[in-house]
């Protein structure tokens, strides 16, 4: 009987988890270093942060012995500033913020992934731009982002560059998350 690659990977995965089981058991016995934790988030009402909201609503933090206070900011960049400034312990934000901080010699670690893909979309209102045909039509227009320096701002900048435009060709306005 031949063993398929898939079956072999299953056995290897289970074996690996079994080898780590004692470490998981020991980790659960340890006391928490800190039980009061403040999380800064850049627009908690956004679908981007749904996993955080679900954890809060369902009491997952309390179940783990944590007293979590969530502070909602106008955008991810503002939430990150709260962590850098010391008024929050953790930032729930886009991964690229950790990369941007590295360019400033500040090294923060990402330790949880809330989604498999960016949950940000760009849209043009037919009411405001009924004749929109291409990204070139955005020249001279106002584009709303959650906050300057936020992941929405970065996405807009990337989109503009991909279509031969610069940030200076438009007015990027921080409008918050709501």
PLM segments and residue spans:
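Short, glycine-/small- and polar/acidic-enriched structural segments
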Residues: 29-167, 171-175
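N-terminal export signals
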Residues: 7-26
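Secretory targeting signals
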Residues: 1-3
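Active-site-proximal beta-alpha loop/turn segments in soluble metabolic enzymes
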Residues: 178
